[in-house]
Amino acid sequence: METRKDDMEKRNDKSEPLLLPENGSDVSEEASWMVYLSTIIAVCGSYEFGTCVGYSAPTQFGIMEELNLSYSQFSVFGSILNMGAVLGAITSGKISDFIGRKGAMRLSSVISAIGWLIIYLAKGDVPLDFGRFLTGYGCGTLSFVVPVFIAEISPRKLRGALATLNQLFIVIGLASMFLIGAVVNWRTLALTGVAPCVVLFFGTWFIPESPRWLEMVGRHSDFEIALQKLRGPQANITREAGEIQEYLASLAHLPKATLMDLIDKKNIRFVIVGVGLMFFQQFVGINGVIFYAQQIFVSAGASPTLGSILYSIEQVVLTALGATLLIDRLGRRPLLMASAVGMLIGCLLIGNSFLLKAHGLALDIIPALAVSGVLVYIGSFSIGMGAIPWVIMSEIFPINLKGTAGGLVTVVNWLSSWLVSFTFNFLMIWSPHGTFYVYGGVCVLAIIFIAKLVPETKGRTLEEIQAMMM
């Protein structure tokens, strides 16, 4: 270790940029079973995220009837999740930097489990809302720390596929709430939300901490032990460990980043890419389409049940396809571009269906047009814009910025999510077809943004990505 430290000091004495190998042939590319176990444990947090978001839809009428809630009271219950998530997102970066990635996941699982138990025991709207707020806080923290943890433990050749499992398990969590909610009451459904929290809390005791975080806080021996576990006992980790240590050493003299540091010219590109992707992920209208899909089908004269079943199956299948086969073969940028173009087509199909209905034209094809538009839109979102912004967010930020910048982009995501959900009904009242033409316009802006600013990160180490963007 002393020799390695001396080497790093010699390198740092030279005023040379950090140059990393282009082909990375000497970097450990092996992944032991521990990488897969660690990822599966971590995405229990993603599944928990999905259950939180999906809980309100199948429970609305049961909760309102049993607790005698008005529509406005239930609307508060539904939306307060976002308020808790924003607070969780604001604090997530600092918490994960202070107590570690595993510590942040454990804390979030405990808070979420308490929230679910309060919902289960609720006798009125106040405890119901408080429990929902706590689950939202857990969601906000998990939405940041899970993709970051996966990115930091994964070999670069698997990082995209493993990181995309975050979105896949969010979708599975959403779908499970709809399926289980169809056969159990709302209190029992709340108890099912505790299960992933329990698995996540206890599972983190059996997996290593992020090696990069361990090195960042000066736990050098733990860093090497964790990296060796993740790469396998026979793997040669010398080069990979050296790159990580050299890169972190180059950042060691820098103070902890503040929000003002994010607008510094050497950091602004990281922030623009991260914030921009989160902005476009939401403002293409995804929450409006998902939350009100049944309303869209009914308004267009299509079967809401059939449409909901089709888009739920499609979302899981295509997210899995993107996670396992495409992201590390085709790359991030091509999938993002294809996703945005597909969503534009979906928006035009849905918008045209409402325009035809408003003018009483081609009434016999309107249901097929609306359903196909939603399916094209959801499918396109699932292969790219759903998962990849979180993957890129976890890859691009230097570790000294990751807490502050990652927290910022997660807050932007949750605030954008709330704003889209809140404004969707007002836009639909203004003009159903105009709503989707507006979202289509945002898709066009997203295509331009991706083409001009988003880097390709496939096949690069985290240190290479961050050096490339400096």
From Swiss-Prot:
Sugar transporter. GO terms for cellular component: membrane; nucleus. Its main location: membrane. It is found in: Membrane. Residues 1-16 have a biased composition (Basic and acidic residues). It comes from the Eukaryota. The keyword Membrane applies. This is Sugar transporter ERD6-like 8. InterPro entries: MFS_dom, MFS_ERD6/Tret1-like, MFS_sugar_transport-like, MFS_trans_sf, MFS_Trehalose_Transporter, Sugar/inositol_transpt, Sugar_transporter_CS.
